[in-house]
Amino acid sequence: MVARVGLLLRALQLLLWGHLDAQPAERGGQELRKEAEAFLEKYGYLNEQVPKAPTSTRFSDAIRAFQWVSQLPVSGVLDRATLRQMTRPRCGVTDTNSYAAWAERISDLFARHRTKMRRKKRFAKQGNKWYKQHLSYRLVNWPEHLPEPAVRGAVRAAFQLWSNVSALEFWEAPATGPADIRLTFFQGDHNDGLGNAFDGPGGALAHAFLPRRGEAHFDQDERWSLSRRRGRNLFVVLAHEIGHTLGLTHSPAPRALMAPYYKRLGRDALLSWDDVLAVQSLYGKPLGGSVAVQLPGKLFTDFETWDSYSPQGRRPETQGPKYCHSSFDAITVDRQQQLYIFKGSHFWEVAADGNVSEPRPLQERWVGLPPNIEAAAVSLNDGDFYFFKGGRCWRFRGPKPVWGLPQLCRAGGLPRHPDAALFFPPLRRLILFKGARYYVLARGGLQVEPYYPRSLQDWGGIPEEVSGALPRPDGSIIFFRDDRYWRLDQAKLQATTSGRWATELPWMGCWHANSGSALF
C-alpha cells in the first residue's frame, strides 16, 4: 500500500508536464486509477469490503467525498487538482471516522438549529476519550539534528495549546514509569501494521491513535524544523497528533489545526473555532470558568530561542556555540578564511583554527540587517558581504551599506527566500540556491545570467534545500543541510564525502580545543 501510494508522486510529474489530460488517458489513466484507489482505501474513502476493482460508481463517489473534504470542486473525476491534493503531505490517520459526521455537522451549520447538540454527538459518539482530566506524557526520542531542550519546549507548548482551551491538564512523566501519552519517532515499518509504515519525506508525516492507547508516531525521515523558515514544522504536527490522542478526528474546516493536511505555522491563532469546540465537547471548558486562551502562532516561530537549558556538571564554555547543537540560518567565509555563522539575531566569527567568538548582535556589525537572514555570501572579488531574506538583498562594505536601502531582488530574476548563497571561485560569481535549482548572478550586480536557473543535478549528489555553502582552501565546496554536510569536488562537480559537520569539521568551532575531542 505504501509503495503504491508513493507512486502518486511520480505520476503527478507526468500530469503536470501535460502528458495527461484532466481525465487521464487510457494508458496512464489505468495506472493512475490504481494508485488513486490505493490512496482512497488507505484513508477510508473506499471501504475494505469493496472489491479490489471498484465499480466506476463507487470510485466516483469516493473521489467526490475526497474532493469535498479537500475543499476542491466536486466532480467525481480524477483530475489534476485532485491528484495533486493526494500528493500533499498530511496526517496518516484515516478519515473514515470523520466524513459522515462532517456532512451532518455542515448541514446543521447551514440549518442553524440544534447545532450544539449535533456537535456534541459528533465528538462523543465514538466513546474515544480519556475519563480523567490530568494526563501525563513522555517524549521517547527526537530528531538528532534538533536540540533536545527545544524539542521538549515544543512538546510542552503543543500540549498547552489544548489545555488553554479545555479542562485538561498535562504534565511530563519521569523517564521511568508509566505515561498516558507517548511521543516517538520511527522510520519505515515500525510494527503498527503495513498501512501505518512511514514512507520517507513527504506523504504521511505522522499518525496517532485515539484514546486510550496514547501513542503518537512521527516519521524520522522527515526534515523536521522548529522554525518557520525550512522543513516541516514539528510544533504544528505535534499539536495535530496530540489532538488525535485526545480523541479528536479530522476536521473539514480548512483553517482547522485538525484538518487532514499539513498546515504551515502562521502568525495567527493555531486552533480554529472548530478545534476548540471539538476538545470542549469532550472535556469541557477551562476549569474555574476561566476564559479559553488562544496563543498566536508568532509566539512559536523559533523554539531554540526558548532554550535556557544548561546540563548540570558541564561548564557553559564547554557546551560550544548554540549553533553546534542545532542548525544555523546562513554561513559564509571572507577572504581571510574567517567563518561567519548566522542564527536568529546573532552571529559568530570562527577563525581558521576553530576558535569561536562570543555571539554578537547583527546590528552591532551590520546596522539595519534584520534577524533570521536566509542566505549570505562574501564576494572574494571585493570582500563585500551580500545578505538575502525574502525578496530583499543587502550589500555591505565593511560595516557600511553599499546601497542606502535594501534592494528588491526579484527585479533581477532572483528567487524569493533563497536557501543558500555561495561565491564560486572558478566563475568569480555569486550563486544562489533555491529548492532544486541554482541561479548564477552577473558580476557586480543582482541580475541572473542568461540560461539560468538550472537544475541542481549539475552539482552531483548535493541535496535540495541546503542551508549554506562555502569554498574551502583545498578547492572543495562544502554544502550544509540541518546537521549534515557534503564535500563537493570543484573540478568534477561531484559530492565525494558527507557526514555530520559538528563532530567531523573542527574548523566549524564545535571542537573542544583543549581536549581535542568532540563536544558530543
UniProtKB/Swiss-Prot annotation:
One of its GO terms (biological process) is negative regulation of macrophage chemotaxis. The active site is at residue 241. Keywords: Calcium, Cleavage on pair of basic residues, Disulfide bond, Extracellular matrix, Glycoprotein, Hydrolase, Metal-binding, Metalloprotease, Protease, Repeat, Secreted, Signal, Zinc, Zymogen. Binds 1 zinc ion per subunit. Hemopexin repeats lie at residues 325-369, 370-409, 415-463, 464-510. Its main location: secreted. GO terms for molecular function: metalloendopeptidase activity; zinc ion binding. Zn(2+) binds at residues 91, 240, 244, 250. A motif (Cysteine switch) lies at residues 89-96. It comes from the Eukaryota. Its cofactor is Zn(2+); Ca(2+). Residues 23-122 form a propeptide. Disulfide bonds join 324-510. PANTHER family: MATRIX METALLOPROTEINASE (PTHR10201), MATRIX METALLOPROTEINASE-28 (PTHR10201:SF298). Belongs to the peptidase M10A family. Can degrade casein. Could play a role in tissues homeostasis and repair. This is Matrix metalloproteinase-28. The lineage of its organism: Eukaryota, Metazoa, Chordata, Craniata, Vertebrata. The gene is MMP28.
